[in-house]
Amino acid sequence: MDWIIRGRKELSCSYMEAGAAFLGEDILAFIQGGDKPHIGCTVQSVPRPSLTGNGTISVTSSILNLTGHKDEALCRRLAEKLCRATGRVVVCTGGFHIDNMKPEQIDEVVKALDGLADEIVSGIAGAGYSPLSTGF
């Protein structure tokens, strides 16, 4: 398995990395960073028709958290964005940890992740992978 795209953002407090690879038609993504990269959460996101009936893709996600870990917000954010953009099943795992983070540092981490997510979506398209026809 080759990582289709892998990116890194330097932060004022540390760094964040994210990447994605294909497993058949599905996507495996990861997040890591901070002082103690780890696996704190795994999210599986599955595309489905939006309940609005307007033909857009929505997502249903299942979450596995390690006790005491708060990595769901980041892993879920990346998994659901990739799932919506590609119409593919996405599993994202990883963790980001810095002791005693300040609110502005949390905001910086979220913005970095959003930038990495955009890079991954572009990288998937640039590698020639088009969104799946979901058949909804």
Where are these regions (language model features)?
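Ser/Thr/Pro-rich, acidic low-complexity intrinsically disordered regulatory segments
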Residues: 1-2, 11, 134
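Conserved mixed alpha/beta catalytic, RNA-binding, or beta-rich assembly cores of soluble enzyme
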Residues: 7-85, 89-98, 103-131
